[in-house]
Design a protein with these regions (language model features):
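Positively charged, low-complexity intrinsically disordered leader regions
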Residues: 1-6, 278-284
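Conserved beta-loop-beta/alpha segment of the NTase-like Rossmann-fold superfamily
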Residues: 73-75, 86-174, 218
Length: 290
């Protein structure tokens, strides 16, 4: 199976980061020298994705503008002798074929994915959640794509989390080991109680699914919060066809909340060629007075 297409859901309101997100989409908040969503698009491209659909909503037009060409800006930069900056601006629009679709109604992640059925067609596809940034040597989505292609099945990213977190995520039941850090999935449930959980392995923001999910989502009833939950659809999918979990290598940041966003800023800045050295020294000096 060849994975060429990806969906990035970016229709959320970003209420956990208000007032920042009152007028700026949370996906456009800066993470060192690029907006959050650019890192996600770059991860998709590095995993071999050729076409990307970003699911948006009212107030998200800055995302569309960002991935479009800006000829006036490029011309001005070149005129001012800033050729490198002009090339950087153009490179954003050249990264991949990026398309946009409005969710229109906030009916949950499952509904947002179902809206993309025409874009996907009959191909396997990837999902990268717009809040989740990954820091890893091999892109996390590439780890999933390889597992999906090796095992000819859907693949989802998982990580073991403590009890206080598993109740906030989806818990998966792991069965036989299929490869290095790859397991067959037997079942899953959305935000379980501690008595309901299958394990402490949580689904974290990256998926490769077969197009069979669309027929399932079309009849999936609203679940928690009266929304169509992607996990409910995947639960049915994994009962009807093989699905695997990838205990991915790397670190995940939830940039949709202040703690995760600030942690990502620090870690990505420390790895930045321009900022890393002086920031490291700045932190050392600051730490003396903490």
């Amino acid at each position: 199976m060849k994975v060429r297409k990806a969906i990035i859901p970016a229709a959320g309101l970003g209420t956990r980061l208000l007032p920042n997100t009152k007028s700026i989409p949370k996906e456009m908040l800066p993470l060192v020298d690029k907006p959050v969503i650019q890192y996600i698009v770059e991860e998709a491209v590095a995993a071999g994705i050729e076409e990307i659909l970003i699911i948006t909503n009212r107030g998200k037009s800055p995302i569309e503008d960002y991935f479009d060409y800006a000829p006036d800006l490029e011309e001005r930069l070149v005129k001012d002798g800033k050729q490198s900056e002009a090339e950087t601006v153009r490179a954003v629009a050249d990264m991949a074929d990026v398309f946009f679709l409005r969710q229109k109604e906030t009916k949950g992640l499952g509904h947002a994915i179902w809206r993309a059925k025409t874009f996907v067609g009959d191909e396997p596809f990837a999902i990268l959640l717009g809040d989740d940034i990954m820091l890893s040597e091999k892109p996390v989505l590439k780890q999933l794509v390889e597992a999906a292609e090796d095992n000819s099945c859907s693949a989802i990213a998982v990580r073991e989390v403590p009890d206080e977190l598993i109740v906030k995520y989806s818990s998966v039941k792991l069965e036989e080991k299929l490869g290095d850090r790859v397991y067959r999935i037997g079942d899953m449930n959305e935000k379980p109680t501690l008595d309901e959980k299958f394990s402490n392995y949580a689904i974290l923001g990256r998926y490769v699914l077969t197009p069979g999910i669309f027929d399932i989502l079309a009849h999936t009833a609203p679940g928690r919060n009266n929304e169509i939950q992607l996990t409910d659809g995947m639960k049915e999918l994994c009962h009807g066809e093989p699905m695997c979990a990838v205990d991915f290598e790397g670190r995940r940041y939830d940039t949709g909340n202040l703690k995760g966003y600030l942690e990502a800023i620090i870690d990505f800045a420390l790895k930045n060629q321009e900022a890393g050295d002086w920031l490291r020294e700045f932190i050392r000096e600051k730490a003396k007075n903490l």
